[in-house]
Amino acid sequence: MRMYDVIEKKRDGGELTDAEIDYFVSGYVAGDIPDYQASALAMAIFYKGMTAHETAHLTMAMAESGDMMDLSAIPGIKVDKHSTGGVGDKTTLVVAPLVASLGVKVAKMSGRGLGHTGGTLDKLESIPGLSIEISEPDFFKQVSEIGVAVAGQTGNLVPADKKLYALRDVTATVDSVPLIASSIMSKKIASGSDCILLDVKCGSGAFMKDVDSAIELADAMVSIGEHVNRTTAALITGMDRPLGKNVGNSLEVIEAVATLKGEGPKDLTDVCVELAANMLNLAGKGSVDDCRKLARQQITNGEGLAKLAQMVKAQGGTDEVIFDTTKFEAAPFRRDIVSETSGYITSMNAELVGISSVALGAGREKKGDPIDPSAGIILERKTGDYVEKGDVIATLLTGDESRLDEGERIFREALAFGESAPELEPLFFARVSKDGVERFA
């Protein structure tokens, strides 16, 4: 077999065989296929697409390119959740303990933040002492004993994706549904859970800017899951405006704790309850309606919060900051962003809010950049709110005073004002499962 022939076949719109896909993935990981041929195939896939079977086989070949976690020794159904990323998206910190507190095991491998979206691991690492580097035996033990663990990817998980993702990033082939779907699902499948819930964001702060492209991606990922016998569903949720009021690392942990106490912002609480309900439903805990009630009950009775504290302690963190969030170290420098006009906030571009928080030190512009755990933004007002000239819209926080001017400049760019209240985008657009697409909006 020659790589040239595989590239030519896809360039001309042909369907690759399983053997051709295996040849490409194993050869690329081994270093036998050079980057220039891999990028030529990625571009051919970008233009010609892939069938559902091709995409599923590519996903499995990538998943099997390294270690595969076998969670079968852990009793019960294991569920995983993946978010395609957004601004203020601290849902894992709420949803994982909520679901685990109802007896469903959550074994989650998470990522770091890159670009304008924050990573769950960076948020968790703002908790003093907490480690996200957990050995495989300890990960298994923690999931078995307390029902939940959130860790960084261990060892040699999906090396094919690491190589292919880095290549797509510099060859303008990121925005391809088969390549995005196989990248996400290969990691989820290699992580070993029985059920996978996908939170596919759409809007200005998301990777997918419109509902139809978000549904197309969700459908591709659900199809892959069903092809490889993983119960999979996806929710399409809005990311036109930041989720909740806090954007940052420790700031988002503080808001997640408030949400588990029943004191969180309504939008964040509603999204977390919906995600938890759908995860519980996939695990066979009842209808989505019944599971929604169960999730809200675990907020009211405090069991979700107790489970988060248990997880933090198990991973070496100081659980007292969960019970008293004032013990988090506060940022030494802050600046109020005051409205220069009176009127309704008609838009608060989530992507620019995210970029502003990165400028303040809450995220990284390139891999390996250090993160300021206390930096970020507290939103006092959001899209749809009326403000008078002089009202505080947000507070910027940072450990480096020199970052405030740039943070403010970008944040102000995110805002638009008008004389009448805007129509707010819904939080939920659709649910995608093996039964098809159910649209809510």
Predicted regions and their residues:
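Active-site cofactor/substrate anionic-group-binding motifs, chiefly glycine-
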Residues: 49-110, 114
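N-terminal glycine-rich anion-binding loops that anchor highly charged ligand groups
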Residues: 1-2, 10-72
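Phosphate/diphosphate-binding glycine-rich loops and adjacent basic-rich segments that engage nucleotide
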Residues: 144-195
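Short beta-strand segments
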Residues: 109, 143, 151-153, 199-203, ...
